[in-house]
Each structure stands twice: as structure tokens, then as C-alpha cells.
Amino acid sequence: MVREEIAVATGAPRWKCVESRIDSKRLYYSRFILSPLMKGQADMIGIAMRRALLGEIEGTCITRVKSEKVPHEFSTIVGIEESVHEIVMNLKEIVLRSNLYGTLDASICIRGPRYVTAQDIILPPSVEIVDATQHIANLTERVDLCIKLQIERDRGYSMKTPHNDEDGSYPIDAIFMPVRNANHSVHSYGNGNEKQEILFIEIWTNGSLTPKEALYEASRNLIDLFIPFLHAEEREIHLEDNANGVPLALFTFHDEFAITNIRKNKKKMALKSIFIDQSELPSKTYNCLKKSNIHTLLDLLNNSQEDLLKIEHFCMEDVKRILDILQKHFGFDLPKNGK
């Protein structure tokens, strides 16, 4: 087993990039550390940062395609290898870079025979193509491909109703997230009361921004969310005079069953957010669990001791170590069998 040595900062916590690479024009990767942190802080920051990276950063996408000569999305055009639906799906994958808001227009107008790629899109000056080689269509004959595009900037997902409007336009399910994936893990070091933590964060982006830019953007968004608390002032509020009030349903003791279900769901969501690589498991135990598709604390708690012993290369010593960690950090236990 190869152990990695990381230079740990002293004093105030500091960020550092320990690994960075470009796998392709549409896949950037970086790994960062934040240290030193007090016990419990790394997990708290890691969970918040991961959610901000995946859900709070904005991206630019093609959200609508318009072609007056096409009767419906699943039709074909003579002289074009792909169906209209396949062309729309290819346009959905185009990665764009822009800082402007609102709806922007773009277009493609090409005559075959030739391949049509992202570089053939006529864009406004404020929008850039990340990978000009992305395939759109193959015109096999002397035919024209003329389509209009709508570009928007947003965050998260935008699910569109699968239908074409009367003007011949087709909405696209857009994925605005420039961060493809983000993981975090925690490493503890030190002894006794002086135990501290290092937070590791891995970020993969689609090339429209670098992982470092994504980390900065996510951090800024989190800070913006907390700023109102820094300026909060206690003052008497008369709810009956508030014209902007929102009616809230009051819980009564008759809603005890509903409250219990809400608590269970919150607990389940929390367990899903805790990954086993955040625990103090040896690499051998961790790898065995990963191969058995056990990735989170919730996955682990859905197994009994008997189930774990069925995992290849797993022994009773591994199970005991897991039981100790569950009891020590979470107050949980595993049943001996699945009955």
C-alpha cells in the first residue's frame, strides 16, 4: 500500500491544491485540502461545499432548438444521417462558457455534404464554445441544415415538457451544472485532545470553468447565504400587520405520526450524505465495502453482520472494527443477522 504524505498547514486553516490535471477539453480535475481543522469541522464544511459545488454554480446551455421545416422531433431529414431527436440530444451536450444573463440567440446554417460540429454554431460575442469538435450532425448529401438556437444561463436542472410548439421549436432538458462531480473525505491526525482533521475535496468540471474557479464560486455563494445572519437585528415583528406574510400550517399533537415520518426522512437523508471514506476504516476494509456497492453510512446500516461476512476477503475482525466505529461516532449498531 502506497501512503501519500501531505504538508499540513499550521495556525489558521488554509486551502491548497495538491493535484490538478486536464483529462480532455470537457473534463478538468483538481484535488484540494483544507487544514488544520478541529474535529467535526471538516465534515461540516465538506458536506456544505459539495452541495454548493453541485447545486449553486451557474452554467450556460442550449435550451431550445427551432426549425420550421421539421414536422416533429422524431422525424428524419433526407440527406442527414441523424434524426432530429439525435441532433437535439447532441446540441444538449454542447458545453458553453458565458457570464451574461437572460436569453441569447444563436444559429447554425450549413450546406452538406460535411460534418457539422460545435464550431459551426454562430454565437453572440459573449458566448464561447469549450470544445469546438463536439459532433452535431453528418450531412451526407447536398442539403441545408438551418436551425435557430436559444441559450440561457441558470443553475441545476431545467426539465422541459417533451413537445414541439407551433412555431417548430423544441425545448431541451438543460443541465446547467458545470461541476460534473464532487467528493470530500476527512483524514484525522494527532493524538488525544490535540486531534485535528484535514478536509480533502475532489472536483471534476466540464471545462467551462476550472475546479479552482468552481471552488471559489461555491465558497462565495455559501458566504452570500450566511451574510444576512451577520447583519441580523432583533426587532419586534407584528405578524398580523405583515402584508407579505405566508400562511403556515400549524402542527398539533394529532400530527405526531407526520412529525415522526419527517424526522425519519431527515435522518435517512443525513445518513445518505455520510460516505464511508469519511470514517477511519483501513483501506482493505474500505475497498471491500466499495466493491459491494456500500458507499454511504445508510448503505452500511442496511446490512447485518452476517451480510458483511459474506463479502469476499471480509473477516470478523473487519466487522468488529466497523461496529466500533459505528458505536463510537454515531451510536449505531448492526444486527447479527438479516432476520
From Swiss-Prot:
It comes from the Eukaryota. The lineage of its organism: Eukaryota, Viridiplantae, Streptophyta, Embryophyta, Tracheophyta. It holds the Pfam family RNA_pol_A_CTD. This is DNA-directed RNA polymerase subunit alpha. GO terms for cellular component: chloroplast; DNA-directed RNA polymerase complex; mitochondrion. It is found in: Plastid, Chloroplast. One of its GO terms (molecular function) is DNA-directed RNA polymerase activity. Residues 267-339 are annotated as: Alpha C-terminal domain (alpha-CTD). The N-terminal domain is essential for RNAP assembly and basal transcription, whereas the C-terminal domain is involved in interaction with transcriptional regulators and with upstream promoter elements. InterPro entries: DNA-dir_RNA_pol_insert, DNA-dir_RNA_pol_RpoA/D/Rpb3, DNA-dir_RpoA, RBP11-like, RNAP_asu_C, RNApol_insert_sf. The gene is rpoA. GO terms for biological process: DNA-templated transcription. Keywords: Chloroplast, DNA-directed RNA polymerase, Nucleotidyltransferase, Plastid, Transcription, Transferase. Belongs to the RNA polymerase alpha chain family. Residues 1-233 are annotated as: Alpha N-terminal domain (alpha-NTD). It catalyses: RNA(n) + a ribonucleoside 5'-triphosphate = RNA(n+1) + diphosphate. Its EC number is 2.7.7.6.
